[in-house]
Amino acid sequence: MTITPQHLIALLPLLIVGLTVVVVMLSIAWRRNHFLNATLSVIGLNAALVSLWFVGQAGAMDVTPLMRVDGFAMLYTGLVLLASLATCTFAYPWLEGYNDNQEEFYLLVLIASLGGILLANANHLAALFLGIELISLPLFGLIGYAFRQKRSLEASIKYTILSAAASSFLLFGMALVYAQSGNLSFEALGKSLGDGMLHEPLLLAGFGLMIVGLGFKLSLAPFHLWTPDVYQGAPAPVSTFLATASKIAIFGVVMRLFLYAPVGDSEAVRVVLGIIAFASIIFGNLMALSQTNIKRLLGYSSISHLGYLLVALIALQSGEMSMEAVGVYLAGYLFSSLGAFGVVSLMSSPFRGPDADSLYSYRGLFWHRPVLAAVMTVMMLSLAGIPMTLGFIGKFYVLAVGVQASLWWLVAAVVVGSAIGLYYYLRVAVSLYLHAPQQPGRDAPTNWQYSAGGIVVLISALLVLVLGVWPQPLISLVQLAMPLM
């Protein structure tokens, strides 16, 4: 096909981030300067965000058979770019105390965000696999960035080996799907499934293997075993990216796949996904109860959040409300996670060995950093789904979708999981207001609110509260971001 100027406009975010990768690479080769490379990365990501307006003006279109640029792709591209931007701003003060090479961090984040944008636009199983690999490979380096820390290196090796195994499952599943249907395009797969091919054993085996591969990337039970160790071992800014950008991008492409190729019409697939969702919600919340490490706690909580989202995915065939539910929930999850991990990043900056991830480090935080403690409280309440926060709106949507689709056992799991989650989120919030220990451990800088990371954390808290009280702007945005059918 011929690439026209319209196609280039549609690909602007991808092209801008790709160009930023090249510029940062050349800048590192020319002269190592931490501030310069961080600034170039942030400018590139901001330019990519601004370019989404021009993409919207160009309208929805297919750019090559691999990619479809529409409102849905723009929404998920925007969320990935916001997460990448936050990761870079949290990383800057953390890297200030890091004695080894600092600049490559931004390069790896940019390449991973490139993979996230590709996933948001993917309309083909080949693009899906390329995007997942492009987002996973830089994460191997990012997770082990503090390689002199034994735990960071261990987390990187663990993620690398398990990720390679998951990718092989995904690829083998795609091969079986192609062998049976002769197609890799989402829409062509949809036509094949419509012709009565959905119940073919080879096709179901292929989709089963793909669910294993994607379940690992989304850290769904029982493919979640890497999650707490990797969240704990990775530097705090990397855990931010891992919890937000990679999960959002992969879940977005899975939504598009299930929408165009209605795999969920198969009772066998629905039952398997239902069991995975149920296990993720209950197991994630139960395991988080006993955690004293805040990054491990957030790791287990992310398993349960992906379980809640899976309920909306299973209900996808029951109406457009499922699409809305996922969009609103992911936005709430993004801002809540950015705030929570942002506070951990600020407390851990500059780099001085292990992060401030023990719950004891946050005991009595209110008495010397009251605003930071208030931000952390808001994030915990939002993740718990308390009314007047954005997390409540997302959870309400998921429950409404579950009821609409008559998924009563999953609705019960969401209610029970939320009740369990309330305990451990409030445990973190309450510890912030207890008496401070005689010898406080790590602490955020006194002027944290004037740093770029501090501003991101404050904006996240503000959005969680404002959109929790008045969610209509977000709901309208998500309704506009419907995929081109």
Curated annotation (Swiss-Prot):
Protein keywords: Cell inner membrane, Cell membrane, Membrane, NAD, Quinone, Translocase, Transmembrane, Transmembrane helix, Transport, Ubiquinone
Record-annotated membrane-spanning stretches: 8-28, 35-55, 71-91, 105-125, 127-147, 159-179, 203-223, 235-255, 271-291, 297-317, 326-346, 373-393, 408-430, 455-475
Catalytic class of the enzyme: translocase
EC assignment: 7.1.1.-
Catalytic reaction equation(s): a quinone + NADH + 5 H(+)(in) = a quinol + NAD(+) + 4 H(+)(out)
Gene Ontology biological process terms in this record: ATP synthesis coupled electron transport
Keyword Aminoacyl-tRNA synthetase: no
Location of the protein in the cell: Cell inner membrane
Keyword Transmembrane annotated: yes
Gene Ontology MF terms in the entry: NADH dehydrogenase (ubiquinone) activity; NADH:ubiquinone reductase (non-electrogenic) activity; quinone binding
Gene Ontology CC: plasma membrane
Topology class, membrane: Multi-pass membrane protein
Pfam families given in the database record: Proton_antipo_M
HAMAP family: NDH1_NuoN_1
PANTHER family: NADH DEHYDROGENASE (PTHR22773)
Family from the record: Belongs to the complex I subunit 2 family.
SUBUNIT field: NDH-1 is composed of 13 different subunits. Subunits NuoA, H, J, K, L, M, N constitute the membrane sector of the complex.
NCBIfam families for the chain: NDH_I_N, PRK05777.1-1
Function comment: NDH-1 shuttles electrons from NADH, via FMN and iron-sulfur (Fe-S) centers, to quinones in the respiratory chain. The immediate electron acceptor for the enzyme in this species is believed to be ubiquinone. Couples the redox reaction to proton translocation (for every two electrons transferred, four hydrogen ions are translocated across the cytoplasmic membrane), and thus conserves the redox energy in a proton gradient.
Name of the protein in its database record: NADH-quinone oxidoreductase subunit N
Lineage: Bacteria, Pseudomonadati, Pseudomonadota, Gammaproteobacteria, Enterobacterales
